[in-house]
Each structure stands twice: as structure tokens, then as C-alpha cells.
């Protein structure tokens, strides 16, 4: 009986010591500087290297989308005439430079299809419906429209009639014509 | 009458004289043909107001005249003009002072009120004068003819000296005279004609040259302006002031001739100096915000449509903007070198109205080195841990609570069948069983990923969308488990908006950076209606549970030791974020009436050095909050003009608080070190754990309690359950027994001692007493 009690208190002591050790261990471990860096991501968003110019893009809209100064875009891409960029042009967004100063071989050019979080259109469907941020009005644009690329696409239609049937109104440079 | 003196080649001159002669003859013929409608004579239209002038010009020229659109801050301070096409403000006839009308008529067309569109007398005189002097001294164009030219002829046609053009002009002038009153014609003319220096119309001219409104013009100034339309470039008052003054003298003489001035008045006027006060464009103090507003306007009204003279009233408050900018700049200056960051962005949102009080897109718009023109509040960036509250919001919406238990133990997930993803905490350690409160407050990665795995990615995407995150629009299968730790980009504006929704008891209000738009005629074309467009995004309870965790300074102590910039003088809820490779640092936090988001980093995505959100973005967030609280005069923008801000957060009705056993991360023992109160819906899930829910019993507070209050369940899947069991065994040397049927009756608890119940948390506040300030004691539960 007594030995059993001793054994138990021995166990208790060990448990106590273990707990203490655990505590000390923890205090020394919680480094205050490093807090909440997100864990390595399994599907990281690729660093953009190239941007493929879409119809209606201007250097300004591209610089806004990719977060690179317009001057830098002009310099890096050695654009002689920055007013002329063609849809399909490939713009270098960032250059990786090794310590020796040599540029790294560029990985497979990664086009940034939708920087603003838009949805890729189904094949051949280019009528883009969106809601105006001002008042939520349902509008649709076509690729030739000036604001086509900067919109956050919401709904894609293959024909204008479908967009109209869904209650969307055609956007025009002088404002939508409300029927 | 044209009064341009310049020599002309004799052949050209002769051609012109011939043209004028033909005009004279044809004009006489034409003047007989269209009879004036009798109706117009018997019932003359009243002098047109601004709206009527716009209507007339639009119907005649086929397009609405462009006007300067102005953007104001919330207190009516002008932020910027949109005047790329030129400046113009259309005014009604009665708003034009008589002196302007007199000076214009005397200069351009003395018999304007008498003639029928063509002043033959003037033409004859012009012809005679021109023949005499062998140069063109004057042309005989009336105001009506000039208006016809502006309205109907294309710019290239306008300056063409041909008989056809002249004939067309005469015909059109007579058309105008037939159908419109003299007041209408004069009002259209004074609003359309160009005065130089991008000023179209008399109101814009008064503004551009004298920085005055029309009614403030003096006679001398009116005389100067009236002389400009003939040759705005030649008489440009800024470039050739002496020519402009000479021209003004001529106008004064013409006014005297026309009988509008006596000779003594004219002399007095000539002696009077004219002072130019060029219009100062408002210094653009919120360039990113103005561009953002411009974008929204273009999106709705089109690239041409924005030039319609809108008065755009926005939610921005320049005082908040200046304050945020100053604090952000100071922090970059102070700590930028140490952590290697060069830029910061701040956005302040008012949750109830959806208004943006400040938008600092970069610390210097004009600094090319940091790509200052890029608005870092609207560019999508990885949010890091700052996204975790969204995941927890989705969980709380689906029955989880801050007291729910999650096991922070090594785990891996197999991605696309091959690669393994093993989430790790920043400390590299695993902390065993945890309540969600501790997991979120200390920003642990493993529990966040496990939680996401448990509730599913679609659930989180749905909740995020409801809260205000619009950036995640890809198909659901494009998103992986790194969603829980901020692997997917979100603009700071949207992230802060989502926090604002949580701050507003889960009620989503669309962003309303624009509060009201009036068109050129003063009619309201848009008004923000936050109350009518709000919707409950997540339940008030879920919002409260999140808020209570994010404002729980005790719970986050392990990771955020004192002193921490996250601790503020008033109760706030806050979350930080740091992304992979030290690229972005965030701190987003809120009170019930204010949400502030801060980003720190490098625009070109260059990594910082050992920079974590709490020490880089945190101080900016802290200082912005404190600076706002310190200045009572700012409270009106938050909806509390009386100078008393509410404290804490509203506890939703139909809830109960129940004490549950709590422990620090990694320090679980079956004997509870303390009890804390958690909030539960009044209808509690009280079902007892069954034999299948294997786990450990914990001491409970008062019955009835939800099972998680007194029962520590093992994870459901066998692999994790085995790991959990091992973890417990290793630490407690089999001292703990599995108890499948925990006894919840108060005196039959599995453990001996009832632990001390902690006093209520800081954030607990009685409902509907938002305005009563609650006195709170700082508590010291963790032996600090």
C-alpha cells in the first residue's frame, strides 16, 4: 500500500517536472519577432513575368493591374513609342537578376489572364456583363469598348441578345443608353 | 463686329469682299422667306435657366455640351476637376449679369436685340471700311451667326472663309432667330463661346481669369472678358496682359458708343486697374482616390459622359486622408531602412455607410521609385494571415464556436494525387488541442488549414464573397488549402471592407465612395442608399464571436507579447498578416464605427527583411486609430458628432454566456487552469457525447453546457485521432482516462478542483447601449 503510494507520488513528481520542463521549453521557444507568416503555399500564385496585351489595354491600365510604374514598363520593354501597344504584345513585367548580374533564363512566359480576379470567358463568348460600382447598374461591354479590360467581369454572354435578355444594358462611351 | 487687324493679300481681300457682297444679296432674299411663327411672338418663352440652356444646345448641336465635373470631399472641399476637354459651367440667362450682356453686345453685335439674325447695316459698314483700308477691319457677323457657327459647323468648317460656309451660316442664323428668343440665343452664345485658356463660356472665363463667380465680376472685368472671344489667343491675358488691357479699352469705347456708359463712366473705368487672379487648380490631395472615383464614373457614365458637369460628392474626408498619409509616411521613414520596405497604403472605411474616409494608395503619388501612382489599396496582393478571420467566419456560420476544439498536430494533405502539403506554424511547433479562440488569436496556421479542410473551400469562398471580397472569382477548383493562410490575392480595400462587414454586426454595406451626384442642372442623378442596400452577410453571433476573438488581447499574448502596437487605448479588434518571403505586411482592424486597413511592402514585390505585420504595418494602424480618437472634431465623419464614441461591440440578443475550460496553446492539462466565458446561441446544442465520440472529460461550469465545454473530443479521422491520443499519452503518462460519458452534474466532475472563473472579457458589452461608455478593468489572467 505504502509502496503503491510512493510509486504514485513518484509518478506525480515526474509529471510535475515534465510539465515544468515543458513550460520552460515553451517560454524559450515563443520567439516574439516571428509571428504570423503564412505557411508555404501549395498552389502559389505565379510571379508574373510577362503580360499579354489585351484589346483596349493602355500602358496606364496595365501599370495599374500589375503594379509596376508606367515609366518602368516603358524602360524595361524599351518601348520607343509607348502610345502604340498592340493586343497580343508581350510586356516584360519583372526581370529576375542573379547575383552575378546575369538575368535568369525566363521561365515559360506566364500570361496574366485576369489580374483583377475576373473569370475567363467561355470559348468565343466575349460579351462581358458587370455591375457598375456606382449604383449596381447592370451593364455589358464588348471587346472594342475602352473600358473592356479594366472591368471585373462578372457574367459572360456569347451573344448581345442574351445579355439584354438578362437585363443588361449596353455601355457606350457617353454612358449607357437606358431603354 | 470683327475687329481683327492684319494685312491680307489683295487678291484674297477682293475675294472676301465679293463674298460679302453675295452674302448681302442672298441674305436679303433669305430674310424674306421664313416667317416667324406667330406662337413664338404671342407667347415668348421665359429666359432660359441652366437646364433649358443645356437642353437647347443638346437638341441643336446633337451632343450635350461638355462641362467641368467636380469632385468634392465629404465636407464640400474641392478635391479635383475633371476638365480634360475644357472648362465650362453652364448658367441660365438670369444668372448672367447685365454688365456682361451689355459689354458683349456692344462689342460683338450692337443691334442684337433689333435685327433678325443678320445685321445688314453692319455688313455694309464692314464692307465699306474694308475697302477703304485695304485690310479686314471688321466682319459683319452677328452673335446669332457666331452661335450658328459654333453649334452647327464642324471646327474645320468654322474657320473656312468661303461663300458656301457664309451662306450656310446666314441660313442657320435665320433659322435660330425664327425659332428661339433673343435671350435663348444670347444665353447659348455666352455659354458656348471660347474665352481662351481652356475656358468655355462666360462662367468658366470668370473663374479662369479672376477666380470669381459671375455675380462677383466688376464692370472692368466684364469688359475685359467680353473682348476675348474674337481672338482668345491674341488677347490672352496671361501671355499678353498689355494687349488684353488695350482690347478692354476698345470694349469700353464700344460700350460708350452703344450708350451703355457715359463718357465720365468710361473714363473712370479706363483708369481702374484690372487684377488677374488665375484659377488655381485644387492641389490634388487624394490623387489615388480621385482616380478611383474617376474610374467608377467612367464605368457608369462612359469616357465622354463624365464631362457633363457633375457635382460629385464623395465620402472622403481630407482630414482623415491627411492624417493617414502623414502617419504612413512617418513609419516608412522611421522603419523603412531597417525592414527594407519603401511603401505603405492605408484605407479607412466607415462600416455603417460604406463610405471610404481615406485612401492612401502610396506614400507619394509622384515618387517614381516606388511606383507611387499605383494604388496599392486596389491592387490584389496576398493577404497572409489577415485572411484567417474570413475562414473562421465561415466556420462560425456553420456551427463551430470559439470554444470548438481543433488539434494542432502534424498533418499533411496530398495535393493533385502526388505532392504533399504539410502546413506549419510560424514557430515550427505544434500546440496540441486548442480552442478556436486561441488558434485564431495567435494566428496559428495548422488549425486554420484544418478548419478550412473541415468546412470546405466553397464555404469559405461563399462567405468571403458575402463579406465583400470580390477578387476570388475563379472557378472553385482553382483554390487550394493555402486559402486559409492567405495564398490568394485580395486588394487591401476589399479585405478592409470584409472586416468592416464584421464590425457592422455582419451586415454588409456596399462601398459608397460616392455619396451623391448632381448633374449640370443641379438635379440629383445618384444618391448613396446604404440602408436600402445592406444585407446580413453573416449572423450577428458569428460576427460577434470573431470580434470577441480579435479584440481579446489576453488570448493573443503568446504570439503578440506586450508591448504590442495591437493594444490600443480603446477596445479594438485586429488581425495582422505577413506573406511568404516577407513580401507584404498587413494590419487590418476595427471598432464598431471604423475599419482601418494598412499595407506595408515594396510595390515591385521585393522581399523585406524579417518584417512581420505587427511591427511594420501595426504601428501605422495603431497610430491612425489613436490619432482619430484624440481629435474629437473628427467624430462627426463617423456619425458621432456629439463627441462620444461607442465602446466595445454589441452582444447580439438571444445568446447566453457559458464558462468553459481554457488553456494556453501547448499547455493543455486535464485539470483546467481556468475557465472563461464563451458566447453561445440561446438554443444550445446540449446533446451529450456518445460512446463513439472518444475523447477526454473536462471540468464544466454550469449545466447546461454544450458538449465542447466539458468534453475534449478526439479528431474524427483515425489517423489524426491516433496522433492525438499519442500526444496526450506522451504528456500525461496515462494519467488521464478516456471517459466516454462525461458526467455534467455539478458535484460529480471528473477532476477534483473547480478552477477559478475569470472575470468577463474586455469586449463584453450590453446590447443596444452602444453609446454608454463602459468602464473596464485591465485583467491579468495569464500571470503577466
Q: Where does each model-flagged region fall?
A:
Chain B
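Soluble, non-transmembrane domains of envelope/secretory-pathway proteins that act on or interact
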Residues: 27, 33-48, 58-59, 72, ...
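Short pre-catalytic segments that frame enzyme active sites
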Residues: 54, 70, 78-89, 204, ...
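Conserved catalytic neighborhood of penicillin-recognizing serine enzymes
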Residues: 129-157, 215, 279-285, 400-460, ...
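Active-site beta-strand/loop architecture of penicillin-binding DD-peptidases
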Residues: 294-297, 342-385, 390-394, 465, ...
Amino acid at each position: 500500500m505504502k509502496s503503491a503510494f510512493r510509486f504514485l507520488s513518484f509518478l506525480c513528481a515526474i509529471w510535475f517536472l515534465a510539465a515544468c520542463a515543458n513550460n520552460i521549453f515553451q517560454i524559450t521557444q515563443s520567439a516574439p519577432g516571428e509571428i504570423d507568416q503564412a505557411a508555404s503555399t501549395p498552389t502559389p500564385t505565379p510571379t508574373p513575368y510577362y503580360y499579354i496585351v489585351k484589346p483596349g489595354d493602355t500602358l496606364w491600365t496595365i501599370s495599374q493591374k500589375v503594379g509596376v510604374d508606367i515609366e518602368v514598363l516603358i524602360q524595361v520593354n524599351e518601348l520607343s513609342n509607348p502610345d502604340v501597344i498592340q493586343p497580343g504584345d508581350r510586356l516584360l513585367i519583372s526581370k529576375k537578376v542573379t547575383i552575378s548580374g546575369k538575368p535568369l533564363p525566363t521561365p515559360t512566359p506566364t500570361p496574366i489572364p485576369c489580374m483583377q480576379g475576373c473569370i475567363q470567358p467561355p470559348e468565343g463568348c466575349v460579351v462581358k456583363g458587370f455591375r457598375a460600382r456606382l449604383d449596381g447598374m447592370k451593364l455589358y461591354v464588348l471587346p472594342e469598348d475602352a473600358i473592356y479590360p479594366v472591368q471585373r467581369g462578372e457574367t459572360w454572354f456569347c451573344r448581345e441578345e442574351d445579355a439584354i435578355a438578362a437585363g443588361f444594358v449596353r455601355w457606350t462611351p457617353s454612358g449607357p443608353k437606358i431603354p | 463686329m470683327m475687329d481683327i487687324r492684319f494685312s491680307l493679300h489683295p487678291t484674297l481681300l477682293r475675294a472676301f469682299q465679293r463674298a460679302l457682297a453675295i452674302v448681302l444679296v442672298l441674305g436679303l432674299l433669305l430674310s424674306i422667306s421664313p416667317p416667324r411663327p406667330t406662337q413664338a411672338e404671342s407667347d415668348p418663352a421665359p429666359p432660359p435657366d441652366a437646364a433649358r440652356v443645356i437642353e437647347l444646345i443638346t437638341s441643336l448641336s446633337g451632343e450635350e455640351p461638355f462641362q467641368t465635373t467636380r469632385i468634392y470631399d465629404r465636407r464640400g472641399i474641392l478635391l479635383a476637376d475633371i476638365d480634360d476637354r475644357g472648362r465650362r459651367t453652364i448658367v441660365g440667362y438670369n444668372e448672367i449679369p447685365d454688365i456682361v450682356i451689355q459689354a458683349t453686345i456692344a462689342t460683338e453685335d450692337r443691334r442684337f436685340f433689333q435685327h433678325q439674325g443678320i445685321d445688314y447695316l453692319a455688313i455694309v459698314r464692314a464692307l465699306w471700311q474694308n475697302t477703304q483700308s485695304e485690310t479686314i477691319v471688321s466682319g459683319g457677323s452677328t452673335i446669332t451667326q457666331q452661335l450658328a457657327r459654333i453649334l452647327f459647323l464642324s471646327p474645320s468648317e468654322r474657320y473656312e472663309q468661303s461663300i458656301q460656309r457664309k451662306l450656310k451660316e446666314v441660313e442657320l442664323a435665320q433659322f435660330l432667330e425664327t425659332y428661339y428668343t433673343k435671350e435663348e440665343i444670347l444665353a447659348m452664345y455666352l455659354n458656348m463661346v471660347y474665352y481662351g485658356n481652356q475656358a468655355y463660356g462666360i462662367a468658366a472665363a470668370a473663374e479662369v481669369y479672376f477666380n470669381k463667380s459671375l455675380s462677383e465680376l466688376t464692370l472692368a472685368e466684364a469688359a475685359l472678358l467680353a473682348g476675348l472671344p474674337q481672338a482668345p489667343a491674341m488677347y490672352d491675358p496671361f501671355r499678353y496682359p498689355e494687349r488684353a488691357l488695350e482690347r478692354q479699352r476698345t470694349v469700353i469705347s464700344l460700350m460708350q458708343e452703344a450708350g451703355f456708359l457715359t463718357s465720365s463712366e468710361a473714363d473712370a473705368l479706363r483708369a481702374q486697374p484690372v487684377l488677374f487672379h488665375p484659377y488655381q487648380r485644387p492641389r490634388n490631395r487624394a490623387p489615388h482616390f480621385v482616380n478611383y472615383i474617376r474610374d467608377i464614373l467612367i464605368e457608369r457614365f462612359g469616357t465622354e459622359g463624365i464631362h457633363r458637369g457633375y457635382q460629385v460628392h464623395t465620402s472622403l474626408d481630407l482630414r482623415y486622408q491627411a492624417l493617414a498619409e502623414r502617419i504612413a509616411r512617418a513609419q516608412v521613414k522611421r522603419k523603412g531602412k531597417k525592414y527594407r520596405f519603401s511603401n505603405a497604403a492605408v484605407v479607412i472605411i466607415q462600416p455603417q455607410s460604406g463610405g471610404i474616409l481615406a485612401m492612401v494608395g502610396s506614400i507619394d503619388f509622384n515618387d517614381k521609385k516606388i511606383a507611387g501612382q499605383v494604388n496599392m489599396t486596389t491592387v490584389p496582393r496576398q493577404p497572409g494571415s489577415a485572411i484567417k478571420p474570413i475562414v473562421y467566419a465561415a466556420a462560425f456560420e456553420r456551427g463551430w464556436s470559439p470554444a470548438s476544439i481543433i488539434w494542432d498536430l502534424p498533418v499533411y494533405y496530398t495535393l493533385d494525387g502526388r505532392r504533399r502539403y504539410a502546413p506549419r506554424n510560424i514557430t515550427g511547433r505544434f500546440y496540441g488541442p486548442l480552442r478556436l479562440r486561441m488558434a485564431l488569436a495567435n494566428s496559428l496556421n495548422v488549425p486554420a488549414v484544418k478548419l478550412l479542410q473541415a468546412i470546405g473551400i466553397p464555404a469559405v469562398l461563399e462567405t468571403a464573397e458575402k463579406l465583400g471580397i470580390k477578387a476570388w472569382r475563379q472557378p472553385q477548383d482553382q483554390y487550394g488549402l493555402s486559402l486559409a493562410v492567405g495564398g490568394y490575392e485580395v486588394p487591401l480595400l476589399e479585405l478592409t471592407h470584409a472586416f468592416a462587414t464584421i464590425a457592422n454586426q455582419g451586415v454588409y454595406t456596399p462601398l459608397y465612395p460616392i455619396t451623391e451626384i448632381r448633374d449640370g442642372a443641379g438635379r440629383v442623378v445618384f444618391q448613396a442608399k446604404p440602408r436600402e442596400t445592406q444585407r446580413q452577410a453573416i449572423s450577428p453571433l458569428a460576427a460577434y464571436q470573431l470580434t470577441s476573438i480579435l479584440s481579446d488581447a489576453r488570448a493573443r499574448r503568446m504570439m503578440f507579447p506586450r508591448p504590442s502596437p495591437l493594444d490600443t487605448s480603446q477596445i479594438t479588434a485586429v488581425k495582422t498578416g505577413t506573406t511568404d518571403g516577407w513580401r507584404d505586411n498587413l494590419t487590418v482592424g476595427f471598432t464598431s464605427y471604423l475599419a482601418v486597413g494598412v499595407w506595408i511592402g515594396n510595390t515591385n514585390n521585393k522581399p523585406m527583411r524579417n518584417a512581420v505585420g505587427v511591427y511594420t504595418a501595426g504601428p501605422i494602424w495603431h497610430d491612425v486609430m489613436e490619432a482619430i480618437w484624440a481629435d474629437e472634431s473628427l467624430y462627426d465623419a463617423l456619425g458621432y458628432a456629439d463627441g462620444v464614441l461607442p465602446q466595445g461591440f454589441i452582444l447580439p440578443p438571444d445568446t447566453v454566456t457559458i464558462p468553459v475550460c481554457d488553456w494556453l496553446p501547448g499547455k493543455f492539462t486535464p485539470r483546467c487552469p481556468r475557465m472563461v466565458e464563451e458566447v453561445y446561441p440561446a438554443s444550445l446544442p446540449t446533446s451529450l457525447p456518445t460512446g463513439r465520440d472518444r475523447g477526454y472529460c473536462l471540468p464544466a461550469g454550469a449545466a447546461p453546457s454544450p458538449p465542447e465545454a466539458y468534453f475534449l473530443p478526439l479528431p474524427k479521422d483515425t489517423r489524426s485521432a491516433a496522433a492525438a491520443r499519442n500526444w496526450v499519452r506522451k504528456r500525461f503518462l496515462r494519467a488521464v482516462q478516456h471517459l466516454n460519458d462525461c458526467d455534467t452534474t455539478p458535484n460529480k466532475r471528473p477532476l477534483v478542483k473547480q478552477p477559478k472563473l475569470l472575470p468577463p472579457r474586455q469586449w463584453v458589452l450590453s446590447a443596444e447601449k452602444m453609446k454608454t461608455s463602459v468602464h473596464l478593468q485591465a485583467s491579468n489572467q495569464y500571470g503577466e
